[in-house]
């Protein structure tokens, strides 16, 4: 059974962008002077005049910066399936260029209706002058140098006003400077905090959109940080399945499959492997920890509704990556109730050799971070490293009294050296409750003394446990 090594918090994904591939070549239409100007990408940034500026309703950022697409391709890009390419020009820059050249482009949100409207991105500061309340506005798609003071009566962005007020109260509560609440102007430190909080909120929203674009399962992913100003990890890439390191091959095609008409009652894939069916009629796991799960695979004749296809369907629950307040970094909580013995998520990452894991383990231990998960169901040849490549499970914290249990799963790849790692609930988990598993969990559900006593990588540094459970062992490793 797989054993997870001690892990800590790391970094996050660089910006990705979307671009829609263009249609087949068509006879070129004669370009107008306006289109030629747009294609040169030389339009200068201009500041909106006071007469033009209008504080419209705020709309959430819907994605990371996008590639520059002009001409016919820009107009028709939304009709084609998006794919990732390196960023060329930011979305804000594209929007500004379109407004400058009076061009519309639905794929980047510029229409005839909003072409001349200026949108509030966030509020930076506050003051009262001659009895009138003013807010310093950061305009979406415009640099900070174009920020302007606008009277409250001109602002139609209740959510941003509410966020501004909440951020101010949060800062004052943290600093215990409650006397400044009714001041006619904000102290520079408060204004700076509010701006940083607004920028963090935008960055987390972009990251949340990135995660949901990358996932291939039903459950949605949300992100929140109400604790500090930390933004998304900078060097983390979301993947949905194992990523083999160079020199490692993972067979993705099954060698045999069942021909059952009813996999719940007929002799099925588990029987062929010498084990029992892992699930009951309610799709809950019924086997003991340490027993492998053999699901139906791509060669089986049964359909997607087969009762022996659970892990391969992916996470069905909406989860939230959140910043913990107890010093454990990022964590994961469920937003819906999860029944006991239900599949929650799969642990994925980069598959490396045990020798490479020892080398990386030294580096990670010196930095106080590691996401190494040993695949030792039968042998100890491979390890999953989720430090840079992983899914939501990358952020799940340790607990000595966890609510998730580890199981080894075999679907298309039947190589016992490379089981897939599934996490099932051990009890009913209520909405809002943090998800945890034991980093030293073995098939029996107990800590592996062998792993702790004999692993050279784990002898180097002992990481203190902060789970707070009554049965806490004191250390993660």
Curated annotation (Swiss-Prot):
<dbReference type="GO" id="GO:0045814">
    <property type="term" value="P:negative regulation of gene expression, epigenetic"/>
</dbReference>
<dbReference type="GO" id="GO:0008270">
    <property type="term" value="F:zinc ion binding"/>
</dbReference>
<dbReference type="InterPro" id="IPR050973">
    <property type="entry name" value="H3K9_Histone-Lys_N-MTase"/>
</dbReference>
<comment type="subunit">
    <text>Interacts with SMAD5. The large PER complex involved in the histone methylation is composed of at least PER2, CBX3, TRIM28, SUV39H1 and/or SUV39H2; CBX3 mediates the formation of the complex.</text>
</comment>
<dbReference type="GO" id="GO:0000122">
    <property type="term" value="P:negative regulation of transcription by RNA polymerase II"/>
</dbReference>
<keyword id="KW-0489">Methyltransferase</keyword>
<keyword id="KW-0158">Chromosome</keyword>
<feature type="binding site">
    <location>
        <position position="300"/>
    </location>
    <ligand>
        <name>Zn(2+) 2</name>
    </ligand>
</feature>
<feature type="binding site">
    <location>
        <position position="296"/>
    </location>
    <ligand>
        <name>Zn(2+) 3</name>
    </ligand>
</feature>
<keyword id="KW-0131">Cell cycle</keyword>
<feature type="modified residue" description="Phosphoserine">
    <location>
        <position position="451"/>
    </location>
</feature>
<feature type="binding site">
    <location>
        <position position="465"/>
    </location>
    <ligand>
        <name>Zn(2+) 4</name>
    </ligand>
</feature>
<feature type="compositionally biased region" description="Basic residues">
    <location>
        <begin position="27"/>
        <end position="37"/>
    </location>
</feature>
<dbReference type="GO" id="GO:0140949">
    <property type="term" value="F:histone H3K9 trimethyltransferase activity"/>
</dbReference>
<feature type="binding site">
    <location>
        <position position="269"/>
    </location>
    <ligand>
        <name>Zn(2+) 2</name>
    </ligand>
</feature>
<keyword id="KW-0539">Nucleus</keyword>
<dbReference type="InterPro" id="IPR046341">
    <property type="entry name" value="SET_dom_sf"/>
</dbReference>
<keyword id="KW-0804">Transcription</keyword>
<dbReference type="GO" id="GO:0000977">
    <property type="term" value="F:RNA polymerase II transcription regulatory region sequence-specific DNA binding"/>
</dbReference>
<feature type="binding site">
    <location>
        <position position="268"/>
    </location>
    <ligand>
        <name>Zn(2+) 1</name>
    </ligand>
</feature>
<comment type="function">
    <text>Histone methyltransferase that specifically trimethylates 'Lys-9' of histone H3 using monomethylated H3 'Lys-9' as substrate. H3 'Lys-9' trimethylation represents a specific tag for epigenetic transcriptional repression by recruiting HP1 (CBX1, CBX3 and/or CBX5) proteins to methylated histones. Mainly functions in heterochromatin regions, thereby playing a central role in the establishment of constitutive heterochromatin at pericentric and telomere regions. H3 'Lys-9' trimethylation is also required to direct DNA methylation at pericentric repeats.</text>
</comment>
<feature type="region of interest" description="Disordered">
    <location>
        <begin position="1"/>
        <end position="59"/>
    </location>
</feature>
<keyword id="KW-0156">Chromatin regulator</keyword>
<dbReference type="InterPro" id="IPR023779">
    <property type="entry name" value="Chromodomain_CS"/>
</dbReference>
<feature type="modified residue" description="Phosphoserine">
    <location>
        <position position="455"/>
    </location>
</feature>
<keyword id="KW-0805">Transcription regulation</keyword>
<feature type="binding site">
    <location>
        <begin position="328"/>
        <end position="330"/>
    </location>
    <ligand>
        <name>S-adenosyl-L-methionine</name>
    </ligand>
</feature>
<dbReference type="InterPro" id="IPR023780">
    <property type="entry name" value="Chromo_domain"/>
</dbReference>
<feature type="binding site">
    <location>
        <position position="263"/>
    </location>
    <ligand>
        <name>Zn(2+) 3</name>
    </ligand>
</feature>
<dbReference type="GO" id="GO:0000775">
    <property type="term" value="C:chromosome, centromeric region"/>
</dbReference>
<dbReference type="InterPro" id="IPR007728">
    <property type="entry name" value="Pre-SET_dom"/>
</dbReference>
<feature type="binding site">
    <location>
        <begin position="397"/>
        <end position="398"/>
    </location>
    <ligand>
        <name>S-adenosyl-L-methionine</name>
    </ligand>
</feature>
<dbReference type="GO" id="GO:0003682">
    <property type="term" value="F:chromatin binding"/>
</dbReference>
<feature type="binding site">
    <location>
        <position position="258"/>
    </location>
    <ligand>
        <name>Zn(2+) 1</name>
    </ligand>
</feature>
<dbReference type="GO" id="GO:0000976">
    <property type="term" value="F:transcription cis-regulatory region binding"/>
</dbReference>
<dbReference type="InterPro" id="IPR000953">
    <property type="entry name" value="Chromo/chromo_shadow_dom"/>
</dbReference>
<feature type="binding site">
    <location>
        <position position="472"/>
    </location>
    <ligand>
        <name>Zn(2+) 4</name>
    </ligand>
</feature>
<protein>
    <recommendedName>
        <fullName>Histone-lysine N-methyltransferase SUV39H2</fullName>
        <ecNumber>2.1.1.355</ecNumber>
    </recommendedName>
</protein>
<dbReference type="GO" id="GO:0140947">
    <property type="term" value="F:histone H3K9me2 methyltransferase activity"/>
</dbReference>
<dbReference type="GO" id="GO:0005634">
    <property type="term" value="C:nucleus"/>
</dbReference>
<dbReference type="GO" id="GO:0045892">
    <property type="term" value="P:negative regulation of DNA-templated transcription"/>
</dbReference>
<feature type="domain" description="Pre-SET">
    <location>
        <begin position="256"/>
        <end position="314"/>
    </location>
</feature>
